[in-house]
Amino acid sequence: MKAGCSIVEKPEGGGGYQFPDWAYKTESSPGSRQIQLWHFILELLQKEEFRHVIAWQQGEYGEFVIKDPDEVARLWGRRKCKPQMNYDKLSRALRYYYNKRILHKTKGKRFTYKFNFNKLVMPNYPFINIRSSGVVPQSAPPVPTASSRFHFPPLDTHSPTNDVQPGRFSASSLTASGQESSNGTDRKTELSELEDGSAADWRRGVDPMSSRNAIGGGGIGHQKRKPDIMLPLFARPGMYPDPHSPFAVSPIPGRGGVLNVPISPALSLTPTIFSYSPSPGLSPFTNSSCFSFNPEEMKHYLHSQACSVFNYHLSPRTFPRYPGLMVPPLQCQMHPEESTQFSIKLQPPPVGRKNRERVESSEESAPVTTPTMASIPPRIKVEPASEKDPESLRQSAREKEEHTQEEGTVPSRTIEEEKGTIFARPAAPPIWPSVPISTPSEEPLEVTEDSEDRPGKEPSAPEKKEDALMPPKLRLKRRWNDDPEARELSKSGKFLWNGSGPQGLATAAADA
């Protein structure tokens, strides 16, 4: 033991918090952090001789008041071998715990703090052993141990407490706790009456040694009486067959309830309408009427809560990675038929332009003659006639004639498909409905034949292939504006139809 550092003796089996051995190592250096401030505060709260310095606040669960701040600071400085310790420094250390969510300051009350037992502070140290020595108010935290059993009254209308708000106490419990602070024996008497009176039914089927341990050893003397709404958590046995599960199979047969999947009190998913505590967490949604721990269950339980405290910074809805943990289903599950209505339904693609042309052409192919459709060649880019010599123009005209004659034997469906792929446009209406005329592609070819008879004149027939595809009226207008010789030919009655006028037109149509 270091000189000048009087370390508080390790409590014997009689009472107080028993922290792990490393918290009391005498060889630890002065100022070491082997014991934390909140450990020390809990230690002082459990000791009867420091009741005038720091004590639990009556009526509030986990709340304590520092009656003599300077004395508490002096005791803490002596424990940590820091004689210059004062309450300002100690309060800064307490504010550090605000962020850690271990405790918080009670608003409106001086020197009053409250432990956040919903963060399960104590299971940080799973082997803490509690034995009450003396009078402890009801706000003192109950802590389960592996050597004790805890039993809770059932949910019925004749419960000794009437307050349904968790974490609070009814008037009767507050007056009882006030009497307990003056006389320690009244507490045990009242508890024994509670054992005999209101807990007759939930003691059935439970180890008879548990009640003796609870009363004789004062095991439930420090325990807060739960409100009516508090119920056991683990409802169905055999829920965790996995040996790695944090919970063992309960030896007591469970009863079905609204929420049948057990949830660990170390998880924040458990509804917050009741107060959390490091004692066995109880769910208000199960209707079992008895609850007990065996040592193996308690070992798993404390381990799981310790893991929860170590992971306190995680999201409130995150789960520790337990292999056997079963997550309860959501309450607002959608029906299968409702969930399927949002699925994406793939529809067949719409009929393309090519397929539409094919369907329309099959319907219109009857009144249209095959040579008329066959006379429309593929759209090919042709250089203007002004850039070519007359010899090349004659050769191109012959090739076009042969090409149109060969295409005349091709079935109409194939030509219509070819036409659809190249350019889809409605057919031009004929100028003279009563007289069948040849298609535009034949007209420039006849002009080229006429141009062969007159080699001195530059032919205008094979200008561009686009001219062969344009309507006859537009082509006539263009030639009328561009070619002065065409005007003279039209005046003399020899325009485009080999100088035969309407008679030549009818003859050409008959030949076609």
From Swiss-Prot:
Gene Ontology MF terms: DEAD/H-box RNA helicase binding; DNA-binding transcription factor activity, RNA polymerase II-specific; DNA-binding transcription repressor activity, RNA polymerase II-specific; RNA polymerase II transcription regulatory region sequence-specific DNA binding
Gene3D superfamilies, per database record: Winged helix-like DNA-binding domain superfamily/Winged helix DNA-binding domain (1.10.10.10)
Biased composition annotated in UniProt, kind: Polar residues: 158-184
UniProt record, GO biological process: cell differentiation; cellular response to granulocyte macrophage colony-stimulating factor stimulus; negative regulation of cell population proliferation; regulation of transcription by RNA polymerase II
Residues modified to Phosphoserine: 139, 159, 315
DNA-binding region positions on the chain: 35-116
Domain of life, per lineage: Eukaryota
SMART domains listed in its UniProt record: ETS
Compositionally biased residues, Basic and acidic residues: 380-406, 453-468, 479-491
Covalent link Glycyl lysine isopeptide (Lys-Gly) (interchain with G-Cter in SUMO2), residues: 381, 388
Job description of the protein: Transcriptional repressor that contribute to growth arrest during terminal macrophage differentiation by repressing target genes involved in Ras-dependent proliferation. Represses MMP1 promoter activity.
Protein's UniProt name: ETS translocation variant 3
Species of provenance: Gorilla gorilla gorilla (Western lowland gorilla)
Encoding gene, per UniProt annotation: ETV3
